[in-house]
């Protein structure tokens, strides 16, 4: 599931008013090259970065141990994915206008990763 996140933590880490993540099954994820550097942004939530350049890679949460959320901008072939929902809309800055018809959630509920390791896709 591809999600726009409006939370305060994502805003500060991205330098933008919204971040975009894609959920994967944790068991199917692996780094191709190198090891990430971790930062605990809040209790139970770790964000990772490339040590060499500082690129934000993904976040993981103790609340959703079987899921990992990858920063969409780090992936190749971005046209493959399209956003499914907005999360943490309750934290959205007042002047940011959401201009689509995607589902909006006041918080984050997890369940963005499929058991087969592929990004979750809503049933047709």
Each language-model region and where it sits:
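A short Gly-Trp-Pro
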Residues: 1-124
């Amino acid at each position: 599931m591809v999600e726009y996140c409006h939370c305060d933590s994502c805003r500060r880490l991205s330098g933008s008013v919204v971040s975009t993540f894609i959920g994967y099954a944790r068991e199917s994820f692996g780094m191709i090259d190198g090891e990430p550097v971790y930062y605990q942004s809040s209790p139970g939530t770790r964000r990772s970065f490339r040590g060499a350049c500082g690129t934000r890679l993904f976040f993981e949460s103790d609340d959703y141990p079987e899921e990992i959320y990858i920063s969409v901008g780090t992936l190749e072939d971005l046209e493959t994915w399209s956003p499914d929902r907005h999360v943490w809309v309750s934290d959205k800055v007042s002047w940011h206008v959401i201009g689509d018809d995607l589902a909006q959630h006041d918080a984050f509920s997890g369940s963005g990763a499929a058991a087969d390791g592929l990004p979750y896709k809503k049933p047709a």
